[in-house]
């Protein structure tokens, strides 16, 4: 997981790597691989589609696709970090701890909460 400061809420939040489809022609899986590398320095051997949802369908068309990354290896070459990624903390978190952190509201990122719960319900942790 990553811990990142989010100015609108004035807090550091536990999150999963995430980003935008901001490379022309890029699909969700390619973006997930790129963001994982940019934010953590890890490469995924496999990415499994986990869940996809609209964040606020009453007011936005924003769509989130979450993948479960497996067979991670630390990359020898890490892309330069953007300013927003400079203070990110990357930490391995035991899945049971992550799940309990969602249930106790310590994880407040909706993407992280939905992804962790989906992995738990699918028995993929």
Question: How does the language model describe each region?
Answer:
Residues 5, 25, 70-74, 95-96, ...:
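Short loop segments at secondary-structure junctions
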Residues 12, 49, 53, 57-60, ...:
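Nudix hydrolase/Nudix homology domain
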């Amino acid at each position: 997981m990553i811990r990142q400061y989010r100015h609108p809420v004035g807090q550091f939040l536990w999150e999963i790597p995430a980003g935008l489809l901001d490379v022309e022609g890029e699909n969700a899986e390619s973006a997930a691989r790129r963001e994982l590398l940019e934010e953590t320095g890890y490469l995924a051997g496999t990415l499994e589609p986990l869940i996809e949802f609209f964040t606020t369908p009453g007011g936005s068309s924003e769509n989130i696709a979450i993948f479960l990354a497996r067979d991670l290896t630390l990359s020898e070459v890490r892309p330069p970090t953007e300013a927003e990624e400079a203070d990110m903390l990357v930490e391995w978190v035991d899945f049971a701890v992550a799940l309990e952190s969602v249930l106790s509201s310590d994880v407040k990122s909706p993407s992280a909460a939905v992804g962790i719960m989906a992995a738990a319900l699918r028995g993929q942790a």
